[in-house]
C-alpha cells in the first residue's frame, strides 16, 4: 500500500533534512576556523560529502537496545522527537502566501508543539533504564519547561504589538520597522531562551559529557541516535526561523528599495535564518558551559522577571499613544 504525500509537505521536509545535513558540516567548519584548524576536508571537495558519509555510517550501524529497556517506548521516543520538529513547520511562512497552513492561531500552535517536545526526551531517558540517561532527561525537562515560560511572555509582547496570532500578519506588521529594533532587549532574551530550549551550548547541560556521558541518548545507536540528532538541528533551524519572523521582518527585504524587492522573499527569509544559525554556532565556539544552578537561576531569576516587566511598558506605550492594533 502506498501513502500519498502532498508535494507541499515534501517541499518542506526534503529541504529541511538537506539543510540539517549541511548545517552540521557548517558547524564543524566554523568551529574549526575558530580553533585554527581545517575541519572536515577529505570526503569530497572541501568536505562537502561528509554529511552523506556520516548519514550512511549511522544507517548501516546495528541498532542496539539495552536488555532491560522498554522496547516500544525506547524505539518510539526518537521518532516522536523528530516528528514534532517537522510538524512545527506547517505554519511557518517562507514568503507571502508560501505557507502550508496559514492558521490564525499559528503562534499558539507553535507554542503547543514546542511544549510537547519534552515528552520524547523524558520517555527516552526513562525507557533506557539508565541512571545517566534518566538524569539527562530530567535536566532537559526542567530546562525546557523553565525557558518556555520566558519565551511565552516574550511572545506576548510581540502579540500585543500586532494584535494577531497569525504569523503572516506578524511579519506584515513589520513593514515600517522590524520589531527587533525597538524590542532589541526582548530579541536578545528570546534568542538566549531559544539556546536553552534547544539544549544548545552554553546550555547543553542534558548532554554534559563530563557528567552524564551523553545525556538522555546515551543508550541510542544507529537510526535512534540519528533521529535525535536530526530533531535537535531541525529545532535549531525552527528557532532561527521564529527569531526571523518575530523580530527581523521574516521575508521582508532589508531596505525598502526597488532593487531589493526584486529578490524573492524566501531568499531574504533564508539569509536571516542563516544569520541566526551562525550565531548558534559562534556561541557554542565562544562560550563555556553554564553550571546547572546558573542556568536555572538565569531562567527564573533574570529572564522571567525581565520578560514580564517588558510586557507592562510596551502595552502602556501602545495605550498611551493609541497605537494598539
Curated annotation (Swiss-Prot):
Coiled coil: none annotated. It is found in: Mitochondrion inner membrane. Its main location: mitochondrion. This is NADH-ubiquinone oxidoreductase chain 1. InterPro entries: NADH_UbQ_OxRdtase_su1/FPO, NADH_UbQ_OxRdtase_su1_CS. GO terms for molecular function: NADH dehydrogenase (ubiquinone) activity. Belongs to the complex I subunit 1 family. It comes from Arabidopsis thaliana (Mouse-ear cress). Its EC number is 7.1.1.2. A stretch of 270 kb of the mitochondrial genome is duplicated within the centromere of chromosome 2 resulting in the duplication of the gene. The expression of the duplicated genes (At2g07785 and At2g07786) is not demonstrated. They are also probably not RNA edited and therefore differs in all the positions known to be edited. The keyword Transport applies. Complex I is composed of at least 49 different subunits.
Amino acid at each position: 500500500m502506498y501513502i500519498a504525500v502532498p508535494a507541499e509537505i515534501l517541499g518542506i521536509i526534503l529541504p529541511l533534512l538537506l539543510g540539517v545535513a549541511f548545517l552540521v558540516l557548517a558547524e564543524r567548519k566554523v568551529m574549526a576556523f575558530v580553533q585554527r584548524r581545517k575541519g572536515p576536508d577529505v570526503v569530497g571537495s572541501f568536505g562537502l560529502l561528509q554529511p552523506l558519509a556520516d548519514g550512511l555510517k549511522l544507517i548501516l550501524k546495528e541498532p542496539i537496545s539495552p536488555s532491560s529497556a522498554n522496547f516500544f517506548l525506547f524505539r518510539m521516543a526518537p521518532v516522536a522527537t523528530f516528528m514534532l520538529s517537522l510538524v512545527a513547520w506547517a505554519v511557518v511562512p517562507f514568503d507571502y502566501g508560501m505557507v502550508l497552513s496559514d492558521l490564525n492561531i499559528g503562534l499558539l500552535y507553535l507554542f503547543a508543539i514546542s511544549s510537547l517536545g519534552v515528552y520524547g526526551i523524558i520517555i527516552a531517558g526513562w525507557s533506557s533504564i539508565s541512571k545517566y540517561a534518566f538524569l539527562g532527561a530530567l535536566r532537559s525537562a526542567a530546562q525546557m519547561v523553565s525557558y518556555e515560560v520566558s519565551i511565552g511572555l516574550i511572545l506576548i509582547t510581540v502579540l500585543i504589538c500586532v494584535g494577531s496570532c497569525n504569523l503572516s500578519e506578524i511579519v506584515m506588521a513589520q513593514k515600517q520597522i522590524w520589531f527587533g529594533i525597538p524590542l532589541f532587549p526582548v530579541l536578545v532574551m528570546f534568542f538566549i531562551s531559544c539556546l536553552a530550549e534547544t539544549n544548545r551550548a552554553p546550555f547543553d547541560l542534558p548532554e554534559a559529557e563530563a557528567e552524564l556521558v551523553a545525556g538522555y541518548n546515551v543508550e541510542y545507536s544507529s537510526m535512534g541516535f540519528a533521529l535525535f540528532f536530526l530533531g535537535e538541528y531541525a529545532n535549531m533551524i525552527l528557532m532561527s526561523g521564529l527569531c526571523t519572523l518575530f523580530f527581523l521582518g521574516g521575508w521582508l527585504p532589508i531596505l525598502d528599495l526597488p532593487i531589493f524587492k526584486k529578490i524573492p522573499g524566501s531568499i531574504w527569509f533564508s539569509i536571516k535564518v542563516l544569520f541566526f544559525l551562525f550565531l548558534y554556532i559562534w556561541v557554542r565556539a565562544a562560550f563555556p558551559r553554564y553550571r546547572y544552578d546558573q542556568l536555572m537561576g538565569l531562567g527564573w531569576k533574570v529572564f522571567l522577571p525581565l520578560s514580564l516587566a517588558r510586557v507592562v511598558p510596551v502595552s502602556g506605550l501602545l495605550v498611551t499613544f493609541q497605537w494598539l492594533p
